[in-house]
């Protein structure tokens, strides 16, 4: 059977591949500690679940408007105003089946074959593949631990060509945990201001999971004049431990939002009606429900960073946001390769070695466009983290 060139250009999710391999080994009786997951280990808060149960009992189980219910859109508008000082109208809001669909809709609505999308690396694994589905060209700007995984204005300017159509910024970052400051975003905005045809996608999914104590800002807080060509992407998955509910949302120029809604109308149509009620309860409800989770992430972040940095050959920064440690393992790879312990000098070989010998599942940095690193999620118990570090330290000693 012939498959399209489009589908052959994309790869299965590396994070899901790690999870699947870890699950297979676990089923074989191995005591696997999974640190590959990209979701909180907390339960959805009770008041959110109760809202969904009430919706079911009230029969709110039919189609809704493609772009989301009017009341959920209003909750999103209120959230943007209250927390981000951003003003949107209902026609500038779209609710989708997860943040991934929001970005998918945006790319399909704005990118033509050959159009270039600038993506700083390391990046969320889905960005480039979604661009490839639209037959666009991902253009990567490489960073590393030396740059704290953040691009400079000069790097951005050098990446721009006449074919550049979109720039993607993700802060706090999955996988690196880096967070752009107001001043850094202002500097990037100064470059983008010179190129009025470039759209800006700011992925704020980890907005509330800030670990450094500083307040959240995105590029529109830094450069309000760019609002007419910026789409703000967000969702309830991470902040409210609602990954399985599949509700993402975005705010942006009405013409782009309408185009995105047209794309969505021919794929999933409306997001799940019950999940929309739950998302509305999350956005309108008591926001203190996030506090215990974020405090736990801060404690785990501090422990994991200190513990990993005590192991010879690996190094990581204290994450400023999200719930990942993005670990530089280049020295460890070099040593193991010299000793002919690894099959090759890739981070994939290293992560396979750690999985098979230490029984700890991690995602290789190359999955995020950053060879020589591994991503460890600390969205798990402290006991799991302590045991995982103990195993990795023993393996690399």
Curated annotation (Swiss-Prot):
* Alphabetical list of PANTHER family matching this protein: ASPARTATE AMINOTRANSFERASE (PTHR46383:SF1)
State any GO CC term: cytoplasm
Task: Please name the source species.
Answer: Nitrosomonas europaea (strain ATCC 19718 / CIP 103999 / KCTC 2705 / NBRC 14298)
One molecular function GO term is:
L-aspartate:2-oxoglutarate aminotransferase activity
Modification sites for N6-(pyridoxal phosphate)lysine: 238
Its required cofactor(s), as named, are: pyridoxal 5'-phosphate
Q: What is this protein called?
A: Aspartate/prephenate aminotransferase
Q: What does this protein do?
A: Catalyzes the reversible conversion of aspartate and 2-oxoglutarate to glutamate and oxaloacetate. Can also transaminate prephenate in the presence of glutamate, with lower efficiency.
Any idea which UniProt keywords this protein has? Aminotransferase, Cytoplasm, Pyridoxal phosphate, Transferase
Mind telling me which Gene3D superfamilies this protein's record contains?
A: Aspartate Aminotransferase, domain 1, Type I PLP-dependent aspartate aminotransferase-like (Major domain)
Localization terms from the record = Cytoplasm
Task: State the oligomer form and interacting partners.
Answer: Homodimer.
- UniProt cross-references to CDD domains, sorted A to Z: AAT_like (cd00609)
- Offer one Pfam family short name for this entry: Aminotran_1_2
Catalytic reaction annotation: L-aspartate + 2-oxoglutarate = oxaloacetate + L-glutamate; L-arogenate + 2-oxoglutarate = prephenate + L-glutamate
Q: What is its EC number?
A: 2.6.1.1, 2.6.1.79
Recorded hits in InterPro entries, A to Z, give: Aminotransferase_I/II_large (IPR004839), AspAT/PAT-like (IPR050596), NHTrfase_class1_PyrdxlP-BS (IPR004838), PyrdxlP-dep_Trfase (IPR015424), PyrdxlP-dep_Trfase_major (IPR015421), PyrdxlP-dep_Trfase_small (IPR015422)
PROSITE patterns (UniProt xref): AA_TRANSFER_CLASS_1 (PS00105)
Q: Which family does it belong to?
A: Belongs to the class-I pyridoxal-phosphate-dependent aminotransferase family.
Record flagged with keyword Disulfide bond? no
Where is the site Important for prephenate aminotransferase activity? 11
Q: Where does L-aspartate bind?
A: 38, 124, 174, 375
Please state the span of the N-terminal signal peptide per the UniProt entry: none
- GO BP terms: amino acid metabolic process; biosynthetic process
């Amino acid at each position: 059977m012939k498959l399209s060139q489009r589908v052959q250009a994309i790869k299965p999710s590396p994070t899901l591949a790690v999870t699947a391999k870890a699950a297979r080994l676990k089923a074989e009786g191995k005591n696997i500690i999974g640190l590959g997951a990209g979701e909180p280990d907390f339960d959805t808060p009770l008041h959110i679940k109760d809202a969904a149960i009430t919706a079911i009992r009230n029969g709110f189980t039919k189609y809704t408007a493609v772009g989301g219910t009017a009341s959920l859109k209003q909750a999103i508008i209120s959230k943007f105003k209250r927390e981000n000082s951003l003003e949107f109208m209902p026609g500038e809001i779209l609710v989708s089946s997860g943040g991934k669909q929001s970005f998918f809709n945006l790319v399909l609505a704005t990118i033509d074959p050959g159009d270039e999308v600038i993506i700083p690396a390391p990046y969320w694994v889905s960005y480039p593949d979604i661009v490839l589905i639209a037959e666009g060209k991902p253009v990567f700007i490489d960073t590393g631990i030396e740059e704290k995984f953040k691009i400079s204005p000069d790097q951005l300017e050098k990446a721009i060509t006449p074919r550049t159509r979109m720039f993607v910024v993700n802060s706090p970052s999955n996988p690196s945990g880096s967070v752009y400051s107001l001043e850094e975003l202002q500097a990037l905005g100064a470059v983008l201001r010179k190129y009025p045809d470039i759209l800006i996608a700011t992925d704020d999914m980890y907005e509330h999971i800030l670990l450094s104590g500083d307040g959240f800002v995105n590029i529109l807080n830094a450069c309000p004049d760019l609002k007419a060509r910026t789409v703000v992407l967000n969702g309830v998955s991470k902040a409210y431990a609602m990954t399985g509910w599949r509700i993402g949302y975005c705010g942006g120029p009405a013409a782009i939002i309408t185009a995105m809604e047209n794309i969505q109308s021919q794929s999933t149509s409306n997001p799940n009606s019950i999940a929309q009620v739950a998302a509305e309860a999350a956005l309108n409800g008591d926001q203190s429900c996030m506090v215990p989770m974020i405090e736990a992430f801060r404690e785990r972040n501090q422990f994991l960073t200190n513990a990993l940095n005590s192991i010879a050959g690996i190094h990581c920064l204290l994450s400023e946001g999200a719930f990942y440690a993005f670990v530089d393992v280049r020295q460890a790879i070099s040593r193991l390769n010299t000793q002919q312990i690894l099959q090759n000098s890739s981070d994939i070989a290293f992560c396979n070695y750690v999985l098979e010998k230490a029984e700890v599942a991690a995602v290789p940095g190359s999955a995020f466009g950053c060879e020589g690193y591994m991503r460890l999620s600390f969205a798990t118990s402290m006991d799991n983290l302590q045991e995982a570090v103990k195993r990795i330290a023993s393996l690399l000693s």
